[in-house]
């Protein structure tokens, strides 16, 4: 049986996850308190941007946040024009589409308290999965569902 690396592939890695927000500064502050690091911030507009997104005359500001290990990136984007379309942020956890971002944390309770100071609200409560994980869902900026997982024990 061929190993995954033996196949001809075009995907090298998952580069980033894009999250569209209404207040970029608030989103940066929230994810900073979670432990992500601001890697860069810039305005994006012009023919290349319009061609890529299919929007006409777009102007958006992006901020790239990176996890402490450097392996994962979160691209936060606030559109200045055209205005953002729709808001499914208040939908329940089982709404179709991308609904959550999960982060492994060292101390779930400390992380929750830091994020609550930036408007986060628990969706349910902190739950224990066997003796392996503490897990919870929070709502962050614009209703983004952020899941936290603190590993307690051996995964085997």
Which positions does each model-derived feature cover?
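Eukaryotic phosphotyrosine signaling hubs
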Residues: 14-16, 96-100
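Terminal, regulation- and interaction-focused segments at domain boundaries
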Residues: 8, 13-15, 19
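Core segments of cupin and vicinal oxygen chelate
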Residues: 20-71, 117, 136-139
């Amino acid at each position: 049986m061929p190993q995954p690396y033996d196949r001809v592939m075009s995907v090298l890695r998952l580069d980033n996850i894009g999250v569209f927000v209404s207040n970029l500064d608030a989103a940066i502050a929230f994810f900073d308190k979670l432990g992500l690091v601001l890697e860069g911030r810039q305005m994006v507009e012009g023919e290349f941007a319009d061609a890529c997104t299919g929007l006409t005359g777009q102007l958006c500001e992006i901020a790239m946040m990176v996890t402490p290990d450097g392996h994962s990136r979160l691209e936060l984007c606030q559109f200045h024009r055209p205005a953002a379309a729709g808001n499914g942020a208040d939908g329940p956890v089982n709404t179709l589409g991308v609904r959550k971002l999960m982060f492994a944390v060292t101390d779930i309770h400390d992380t929750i308290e830091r994020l609550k100071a930036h408007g986060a609200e628990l969706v349910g409560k902190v739950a224990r999965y066997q003796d392996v994980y503490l897990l919870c869902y929070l709502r962050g900026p614009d209703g983004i569902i952020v899941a936290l997982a603190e590993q307690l024990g051996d995964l085997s």
